[in-house]
Amino acid sequence: MPPAPRTPLLTSKEIEQMFNSREARAVTLECSLDLQVSTSTIEIGPIDWAWDGRRFPYPERFKERTVYYWADADGAFQPAALFSSSLIKLVPTEWGAPTFEIDGIKMLPSAKISPFEDAQAKVALIQPKNKTILDTCGGLGYFGAWCVRGGARHVQSYEVNSGVLWLRSINPWSPAAAPPLRLIQEDVTRAVITLDTGSVDAILHDPPRFGIAGELYSLSFYRQLARILRRRGRLFHYTGTPNKLTSGRDVPNEVAKRLRNAGFATEKIGDGILAVKK
């Protein structure tokens, strides 16, 4: 179950700060409890710590690259991770805004840039102001957040994975599902068939890797995207930069070729393809 709205989030950084402050016999500590969105003052005690009128135990066991949330039902901090058919995990970054992993595969860039700032640059490519936008694979919502900040008229965002939606409910960097952002739990390959022709001004397509969701790279899906997109509308398709020598595939060029066959002009930009409907 999702945590309460005022649940603190901890990483190894904050936990180590708490232990160091306790060892130094400090009374208070300034630290972040929301993945660097803000700073809070907590009270440091010998056996627990206090924040917002509540007391919490010190997590005695913790790992790097893990976000911990307070689970009231367990009376303990638990990893922000779920396992169903795959392991889905929220992963902290040095930038504050987290990425996430599915079975150990990182879903958002974070090695050289904040995944939140990376989303800003990609959303700028489709020029969101006053547009109706389809966000095919909502993920943690960073594309949607920047569309809203960029003045989009309406953002229709799809996310099929309930585990990802649960992570999104925990993540303070994820936007609220409130107008002009509409978040729908549905398979976008099915949903797109029901959308009206020429009903969107721009599209953001950030699918999982080809090996996980090949249907989101298919010519038939791209043709549906072309159908619902108005003429001269923009589509940004994230492909990543897979090593074609080790993977045996040149995914960006394969994507660009299929998009052209679907009726787009294409240009490779960074780790994706910017396409314009002819």
Question: What is each residue range found by the language model?
Answer:
Residues Y217-R231:
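A short glycine-rich, Lys/Arg-flanked "PGG" loop and its adjoining helix->strand segment in the class I
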Residues K129-L140:
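Conserved class I S-adenosyl-L-methionine
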Residues Y158-T197:
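S-adenosyl-L-methionine
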Residues I113-N130:
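Conserved alpha-helix/loop element of class I SAM-dependent methyltransferases that forms part
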Residues L140-A152:
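Conserved SAM-binding loop of SAM-dependent methyltransferases across substrates and taxa
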Residues M1-T93:
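N-terminal auxiliary segments of SAM/dcSAM-dependent transferases
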Residues R232-G240:
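Conserved beta-strand signature within the Rossmann-like core of class I S-adenosyl-L-methionine
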Residues T241-K278:
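Class I S-adenosyl-L-methionine
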